[in-house]
Amino acid sequence: MTSVAPALPHPSLRHIEGIIFDMDGVIVDSEPRHQQAFMDIFHEIGYADNHGIQFEDYLGKSDRAVWDDFISMHQPPYSIEDLTSRKQNRLIDLIQKEKPIFETLPALVEKLARKFTLSVASGSLHPVIDVVLKLENLRNFFPNVVSSQDVPKGKPAPDIFLKAANSMQVSPDKICVIEDAAAGVQAGKSAGMTVIAITNSLPSSALSQADIVVSDYESIESLLLGRP
C-alpha cells in the first residue's frame, strides 16, 4: 500500500492560527460599486463633473477619507454624516442587487474555517459589512468583524488589524492577513502580521510589501492548507 503524504501549508505559514480577511476587493468585488455609489452622490449634489476625487488614491481606505478630502476641497452644504449615509445606502442597494461575491471565495472560506479562527477587518461601515456577509451565508464563518468605525485610525494604520487580533485572541505574529490594496498591506505589516496580497484590484508591483502575492484563491488555499 502506498501512503499519501499529508497536505502541508507553505513553510512560512505553518505557524498561522488566525486569518483576517479584508472585505472590499477580497470577499466582494465592491470597488467598482464603491466608485459608482460615490459618483451617484456627487451627481445628486451637483459635483458630477468636478468632484476632484481620484478614486485610485483611496483604494483600501475608508469612506471618511474620501469625504474629508471632498469637503476640504468644496465645502458643500452637507455634513459628513449626511454624505456618508447617502453613499452607504446607495452602495448597499448595488450590492444587494448585484451580489458580487468573488466566485470561488465562499468555498475557500468554508475550508479555512475548519482549521483557523477567521475575522473580517474592513474599511467599510458595519451596515455594509453585514449586507455582504449575509450573501452566501458567509457570516456563519466570521465570528469576529471589525470596521474602520471601530478604531481611531483606518488603514494604512494597523489599528483595525490589531483590534481584530484582540477579538480573535490570537497573537498578531500568528495571524495572516489577506488583502488586495497597498494601504491594507501596509496596515497588516505594521501590525506585525504575515500578509498575502491578491491581485484583484492592483498589479503585483503595487503590492510588493506583502509577504506573498497571488493571483487567485486556489493559490491561497494551497499556501494555507497545502495540496495532497
Give the positions of each predicted feature.
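Residue-level detector of anion-binding/catalytic polar loops
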Residues: 48, 117-118, 194
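Helix-loop "lid/cap" segments that line or gate small-molecule binding pockets
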Residues: 41-42, 62-76, 132, 165
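Hydrophobic patch in the ABC ATPase nucleotide-binding domain
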Residues: 47, 76, 138
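An amphipathic alpha-helix signature
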Residues: 35, 39, 63-68, 88, ...
